[in-house]
Design a protein with these regions (language model features):
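Bacterial Sec-dependent N-terminal signal peptides
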Residues: 1-28
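Short S/T/G/P-rich N-terminal loop/turn motif that feeds into the first structured element of a domain
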Residues: 24-247
Length: 247
């Protein structure tokens, strides 16, 4: 009887020890993105087809949020995000179903140009000022590309910027690219109060807030660090299209 209790206790302890690893493995902090560009004369047909596709085949971990790109080099394109999900669920996703893939190929892709891009990103909680799932309809995405070998230094820059965001109430979700071209951090500003947050005077100047959060003279060092460690950065505005997204 005593031996049986010891065996059961050992098994229970092993179960508890494995729980943290199970939790880590199932963290839903991954999103996949797909940018597509419809033919100029087929926009209405594309929108109808992509809405039907999203609402029929994309739910749960495969939920779609579809954005219209309003500015920047990809103006006129559509930015599709899938997730959040875990790597495990992405591993099991496959093509979702033969019907799903057939619908995309025959009913959606026929309206697209050859231009497209896509990738994976992982949400960085330690660099963000808003929860992963706290979405908004209007966003700005800033794409930041570190110089080769300078990723850690760019993260250090972002940690200081986060202090300024927190001080001024700016809500930003930060993602790191994963196996998707050059190393990139995407800073997604989620406008909780709409585009009026962009207006001059809505918040204190960034330089003032940054120096309050990081110390007098810190903004000058920030500019030097950006010049030294960042290869390139650019921004764009995107508007959510609920009518084209998953329900």
């Amino acid at each position: 009887m005593k031996q049986k209790i010891v065996v059961q206790l050992s098994a229970f302890i092993l179960f508890l020890a494995l729980l943290p690893f199970t939790g880590i493995g199932q963290t839903k902090n991954v999103i996949s993105t797909h940018r597509v560009f419809p033919k100029i004369d087929k926009i209405a047909e594309f929108e109808k087809a992509v809405a039907n596709h999203a609402q029929k085949y994309h739910a749960g971990d495969n939920h779609w949020r579809v954005f219209a790109i309003q500015s920047g080099p990809d103006l006129g394109g559509y930015h599709i995000t899938e997730g959040p999900k875990s790597w495990e669920s992405e591993d099991a996703r496959g093509d979702i179903s033969p019907e799903h893939q057939n619908d995309w190929n025959k009913n959606v892709a026929i309206y697209l140009t050859e231009k497209q891009s896509g990738g994976y990103s992982v949400y960085q909680e330690s660099l963000s000022t808003i929860a992963l799932g706290d979405f908004t309809d209007k966003i700005q995405i800033t794409h930041v590309y570190p110089k080769p070998g300078q990723g850690d230094n760019v993260v250090a820059i972002l940690k200081k910027i986060k202090k300024a965001w927190e001080a001024s109430g700016v809500t930003v979700a930060v993602y790191a690219s994963s196996s998707s071209g050059p190393t990139q951090y995407t800073l997604t500003t989620r406008y909780k109060q709409g585009l009026k947050e962009r207006a001059a005077g809505f918040r204190k100047p960034f330089k003032e807030v940054y120096e309050t959060a990081n110390g007098e003279g810190s903004f000058e060092q920030y500019l030097k660090d950006v010049a030294e460690y960042v290869q390139e950065s650019w921004s764009e505005l995107l508007f959510m299209r609920k009518d084209l997204s998953s329900k």
